[in-house]
Amino acid sequence: MRERIKATLCLAIIALFGCSTENHLVSGSVSNHSVRNEVALDQPWRFQFSADLPADIYAPGFDASQWQQVSVPHSWNRVGYYLDSASPHIHTQQNINVEQGVGIYRTAFSLDAANQGKHHWLEFDAVSRVAEVWLNGQYLGEHRGSFNRFRLNATDAVTYNAPNILVVRVDNSKPTAESNTADTLPIAGDFFVHGGIYRPVRLISTNDVHIDMQDFGGAGVYATTVSANDKAARIDVNSRVTSHSLSESAVEVEVNLLNASGELTATTSQVITVSNSNTAELNQVLDVQQPRLWQGTDDPYLYQLEVVIKEPNGTVLDKVRQDFGIRTIAITAEDGVLLNGKPLHLQGVAYHQDREGRGWAVSEQDVEDDVAIMAQMGANTIRLAHYPHGQPVHNIANRLGLLLWDEIPLVSAWRYGEQHEEVNKAIADNASLQLIEMVKQNFNHPSVAVWGIANEVDFGAVVPMFVQSAPGSNPDPVPLLKRLASEVELLDASRPSTLANCCANVATWQRANVPDTSAITQTTGANRYFGWYYGNANDLGPHLDDLHKQYPGQPYAVTEYGAGGAPTFHTDNVLGGPVAATGRNQPEEYMTYVHEVNWQAISQRPYLWASWIWNAFDFATTTRREGDSQDINTKGLVTYDRAIKKDAYFFYQANWTDTPMVHITSRRYKDRAYQVADIKVFSNAPLVELNLNGKSVGQRSECTHRTCIWESIRLAEGENSVTAVGLDIDGKELVSDSIIWQLNTSQHNAYFIDAGAQIAATTQNNYFGSDNFFTGGQAASYDKPGGWGRPPVLADIHGTEDRDLFATYRKGEFGYRLPLDNGSYRVAIYYVVNNNEAPVDFNVVANDELVLANLGADDAANDGLNAHVREATVIVKEGLMAIDFVALTGEPNVSAIAITPF
């Protein structure tokens, strides 16, 4: 098996950079325009999850009736599901499928005798991970890689006027150093690699002479805008023409540029001689007068580039036609992105291709819908993470003027341990192969701005065990990165190379252990999660300044930032307690907070050439148990099923678009814990007015980052109607948004505060809110984080049936300020005595009067953690209860506060 891997990779790599002769990893689909015959092989297929090929599977009479009937695109996986019951979900615990192994596909198609004399190609847009293909029992070849298109020459295997039996063996086994998929990237990554024939399959028939079908899935035609302005443009067109004719022949290769109306704008032609089994390569130049440039979202004008092969008598032998935008692109540290010489700041999102119910087997309409969601938010760029995406997203981006970051699946790990050097070399070759395929298949798309060669491989270097190296060793990805960067320049000198790193100058990692990847490629991206995995959200700006100071001549972007958010989890104060970056406590409001703070830092740093949010949509990954989901990364601005746009989505829509919009945040937090709330509204309107229960509570204008806040708004008992109205400068209504919040009687003129908690515990008797209304102190928990995919380690707290309520606490020097009606109140203080640590003694002062003394000091307790409650009566005279905790010995610690009138 290892020899086959090595041979296959060698064939592909060396064909381009100097390795060998024949290559079966071939071309991409193009428009046929009545010259090529193209048949979609979408259904019916039969599928069985099995590693064994039945001996008679190639026979027309083989009985596959017990196999699953499927249509292609297809994936056998269903991964990730939500735990809430607020809405119906396609995925449930009962119907998911995370199997990684081998599946067999079988179908039949027919060709009539009129197709004899043609050459026939089976084109697969993507099969994950390793595909082996047989037609009528004849082995056609294999492809190693989950994402790029490949073609196999089926000419000698087809039959006419009889069924053609097509069998595909798909190996999606999890890569290990010993597996059949060992060399096939990705070998790591925080996303699930779905198995199957998950993009379309078709049969293409050509004449003897045709544009090259064996060029790594590319179109065989590669056009580059050499220069362009509004007066003139020059386009270099490289075409590859293949002949299977038994004799030499002269053909004319004509290149045409058609405008959007189909009118000829520029043309050139050349006569060449082609011979049997030879591929001729020629370069031609188109000069275009008064071109209409492809100017991003401002004017995404598309021509059509057409290459026609003709016989001397004018008979058309082959024709390909693709959308083409005339544009140049450059990226510098001084000016950022220059599109046709004009500065363009890129702001957008990263995008994984899966969605609930389909996995990776999405339709073109699914992709169209996804891109529409991103574009409506105001994104002008998409990072296609962490692998090559299909043609639909590229075509849509061309039409809409979106700029794309394309990248290969070299993610986190690039090798196994030192004892596996043979397969490690094969992995490097597979990286080169997937890079060649990606560049050639997407070369003509004006939307593609950069070619990405890696994502966070510096992580594998700072954590050697991640790449199976011994602790203390220093595995180095830099040689491979330099190789790939140089290959990009050979493949396409018109676009910059790029990569995304994770760890440079992040305090979590010792700088000496982090490989310097920042200046290997022509541009660089930083994946940074301040306020989530490390540090505070406000740390991002100074960190970026540090990078810019260290690499002043390197164009730097932010390629990932953000936080997880569960739309069914809510907090009253994002700073009320610690967030669980790898666990369940991920309130929607904290996610929004991180985006607000991070975007403020990014938008104030013009030296950044681009930024991409992580991520547009929640996506599947079996490494996570977080938020309100299982096996889902919750950082998406939109849920996995596309049903909910989280609040952070509307923050960007307010800041990135001018089409009038208004959005009230925390709308899904309907049953309110507190009678007093800050109401936050995102809007791009000049004026925003807030109404509560039909009465105006004021207008806001020129809100910072288009975020308007009305502080300390008191809700009425029962139903509360909240409406935000966006107004023009003359006070005329442009747009409005309304929600309903509920304040139950038990919460009216009362407080139940779960101190130290960002998400309140569910208790036996009362409805507690998360920690809020505090001044000072520090949030803490007696529970310990469980880490990636593991539940927290719960502390054993004696003396209570509400363990979760006592598990979190606020400690140090702190107090609470609580608006209340005048009157008498019962105040209950919940706290824990830890007899295994130094004693703690503190007093409780309310409105400057001592109401409880010596909490902790007089409490008899068992060993370990013991729950206690002390009560006092407090009279409110001026509409406010001020509670302070005064240390006598050690630090005060309070787990909860309950305040009720009597």
Residue ranges and their predicted role:
Residues 79-88, 175-185, 190, 200, ...:
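Extended substrate-binding grooves/exosites of carbohydrate-active enzymes
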